[in-house]
A protein has these predicted regions:
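Flexible, glycine-/charge-rich segments associated with ATP-binding catalytic modules
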Residues: 1-16, 115-133
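Glycine-rich/acidic phosphate-handling loop/turn and adjacent ATP-lid/helix
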Residues: 82-106
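Bergerat-fold GHKL ATPase/HATPase_c domain
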Residues: 1-47
Length: 133
């Protein structure tokens, strides 16, 4: 089954307001739906994108509407690359220390994104997820 019709690139920025982010991400997903036809891949991409953009606004930018989250997406024949950068100071990511039995209110998002990604990188305030198609 062909997953991709054509290659696709997106580069956009959104302020750290979760209501605005919701509409912004929906618009990006509508554009991706025209390129990626596999529903299970789109489900993963939707979850990855929602988690990363929300994390950037909440944890990186502390909900500051004057700070922005940048999203870069590149879709090619065999992969989709999602890069999300916020204006925060960055953090050290240690997914191995996550304990699913510790019922914290945060911390699961990056574990989920890492699990859905074939490649996952954190560099200060930039997170990259690569999913092979």
């Amino acid at each position: 089954m062909d997953v991709i019709i054509l290659s696709f690139k997106f580069d956009g920025t959104v302020c750290s307001d979760l209501h605005i982010i919701k509409d912004f991400v929906e618009d990006v997903l509508d554009k991706l739906n025209k390129v990626i036809k596999d529903e299970s891949v789109m489900f993963d991409v939707k979850l990855i994108l929602n988690e990363l953009v929300a994390n950037g606004a909440i944890h990186g930018n502390s909900y500051d509407r004057n700070k922005y989250v940048n999203i870069f997406i590149n879709v090619e024949d065999d992969f989709i690359r999602i890069e999300v950068t916020d204006e925060g100071n960055g953090f050290k990511c240690d997914l191995k220390s996550y304990d699913p039995l510790n019922l914290k209110c945060s911390g699961r998002g990056l574990v989920i994104v890492s699990g859905l990604s074939d490649e996952f990188y954190v560099e200060k305030n930039k997170i990259t997820s690569v999913k092979y198609l």
